[in-house]
């Protein structure tokens, strides 16, 4: 059971009804249910849900680790063959290629600040992907989710 989030569900549903793709940001303190809210929205509305989560910031984690984690998660969740990635441009292009045009889909980029923390080009690559790929899809919500320090 999910309690106390009806306003957020309504806002997401309103976005879902629009005839264009939507880009949503979701931020808040750690462990308050941000990712669960998005997953529950997808479940309630019976839409395809792809969750890609950045690796936690810790010693030894590199941009390549983040890219390969993205590739593995994408492969696992879409039933496609794992193929290593070398840059975020290619990562977002692969994601775009796996989002079906006729299938309602929610893509959650979770812990996005961790995901892109080692590549100064990450924000620009994400912007390019939104402007030139994701925004062209009319059955897509892309959610950028991150935690803030309390």
Region annotations inferred by a language model:
Residues 1-150:
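Phosphate-binding site recognition
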